Amino acid sequence: MEVATLGGGCFWCTEAVYKRVKGVISVKPGYSGGHVPNPTYEDVCTDTTGHAEVVQITFDSSIISYREILEIFFEIHDPTTLNRQGNDVGTQYRSIILYHNEEQRKIAEEMIREVEKRIGKKVVTELKPFEVFYEAEDYHHDFYDKHKYNPYCRLVISPKVKKFMKLFPDKVKIHEG
């Protein structure tokens, strides 16, 4: 098992996508990258904690690699917009990769260079060592699956999930049930 901690805008979006990725064991929304201990959602929304909305992904690296996790990451959000994803604005929505070891750091640096070359734009994704993860409040967990008809879910999250499924059909987890 390996862990990845990533922020690509609203954590409801990234959680919804990664829950559907083959090889992903669990996805938890939360806060990381800042300086205030034990922040709440309300604290993070003040733009003063330094934390970003992130997801902590536990995955089976024999099924999906960290590089593949990042390939999906760079497709499901815009890594060229600073402190913003769509209409979600603030440092809590910044693009961030919190690496857990040197191998993850090297892969992330390589991926950032590749994405910049491919799209011809500067990637503003922050890259820093992982320190601590604060799990989000219960009502943020599985938000998309619990509220599919919520306007934000329909207009913002659903297109990201569909984009993932279209671009990475071989990575889609077969839904049981």
From Swiss-Prot:
EC number: 1.8.4.11
One Pfam family it belongs to: PMSR
Alphabetical GO biological process terms: protein modification process
GO molecular-function terms, A-Z: L-methionine:thioredoxin-disulfide S-oxidoreductase activity; peptide-methionine (S)-S-oxide reductase activity
Catalytic activity line of the entry: L-methionyl-[protein] + [thioredoxin]-disulfide + H2O = L-methionyl-(S)-S-oxide-[protein] + [thioredoxin]-dithiol; [thioredoxin]-disulfide + L-methionine + H2O = L-methionine (S)-S-oxide + [thioredoxin]-dithiol
Coiled coil: none
Record keywords, A-Z: Oxidoreductase
Enzyme class: oxidoreductase
Active-site residues annotated for this sequence: 10
Sequence similarity: Belongs to the MsrA Met sulfoxide reductase family.
NCBIfam families found in the cross-reference section: msrA (TIGR00401)
Function: Has an important function as a repair enzyme for proteins that have been inactivated by oxidation. Catalyzes the reversible oxidation-reduction of methionine sulfoxide in proteins to methionine.
Protein name listed in UniProt: Peptide methionine sulfoxide reductase MsrA
Organism listed in the record: Saccharolobus solfataricus (strain ATCC 35092 / DSM 1617 / JCM 11322 / P2) (Sulfolobus solfataricus)
Gene it is expressed from: msrA
